[in-house]
């Protein structure tokens, strides 16, 4: 299959620039993956589509305020750092702009000097290996000095950092939010549990590979970036019990989906596990664990659009996306949602 098979026309004004004031009042497009039938709802109506045997699998990762603005110690020139991946306690793989000023040995200052950094090596695809120096707790300093690493298509400033976190976020480490989860409120989750639906949590730390375009014509040649995941015993048991009792495993977001499919065996069973995944799901892939998916609307020609096409069929997805454009749904990270059932 070619990348161009996953292209669609999207007017720029449909790219959501800010989150909904009430998380669960975004719109919801419901797509039947067997028939291609479409319904138009509000996100909190998701309750009507869940049954007591089902389980929702949610990614409890928390976004780091990983964008730091600092200056070069030697010249005072302004620099932008984006933390990608922790390598050791105070050593990170980092994107640094402008890169030409970030040679090995270069030092940088952030805030009033409470955080300093030195480039100690070169990473993949132009990234830098950076060691940070500070007194106190790194996460607290980052919280104070860092900004949310919003995707490049969001131009507006985010007033409240928590609006780019899910209400159940817990495990710090992502460079982007698992955006399907942004639609849930604590009240909606409570109602879902009261209905007898099980909630199961796993962790996948979202990397910037999520936003990287596919640069090859033939999708099979694309290589994914690896991301860290973990699933505990309790979550594995909930998922296996759901399968045994004839319920559906409903992934909340493509990150939960990719984690489940990484861990699942040929029979759809999962177990306690952690590691790095670079799974690339595209049409032709047979899902082992995931029965249904809650997800946002993705970028044209993106790996995430290919993932949903593998679940519902490319024609069904492309048709649903064209309908969503026609009906002026809001797209991407702060946009509306889709339930593939």
Swiss-Prot record:
EC number per UniProt: 2.4.99.17
Catalytic activity: 7-aminomethyl-7-carbaguanosine(34) in tRNA + S-adenosyl-L-methionine = epoxyqueuosine(34) in tRNA + adenine + L-methionine + 2 H(+)
InterPro entries found in the cross-reference section: QueA (IPR003699), QueA_dom1 (IPR042118), QueA_dom2 (IPR042119), QueA_sf (IPR036100)
Cysteines joined through disulfide linkages: none
Oligomeric form and interacting partners: Monomer.
UniProt pathway annotation: tRNA modification; tRNA-queuosine biosynthesis
Entry protein name: S-adenosylmethionine:tRNA ribosyltransferase-isomerase
GN (gene name): queA
Main location: cytoplasm
Pfam family, one: Queuosine_synth
Protein family per UniProt: Belongs to the QueA family.
Primary enzyme class: transferase
GO biological process, one term: queuosine biosynthetic process
Functional summary from the UniProt entry: Transfers and isomerizes the ribose moiety from AdoMet to the 7-aminomethyl group of 7-deazaguanine (preQ1-tRNA) to give epoxyqueuosine (oQ-tRNA).
Location of this chain's protein in the cell: Cytoplasm
Assigned keywords, A-Z: Cytoplasm, Queuosine biosynthesis, S-adenosyl-L-methionine, Transferase
Higher taxonomy: Bacteria, Bacillati, Bacillota, Clostridia, Eubacteriales
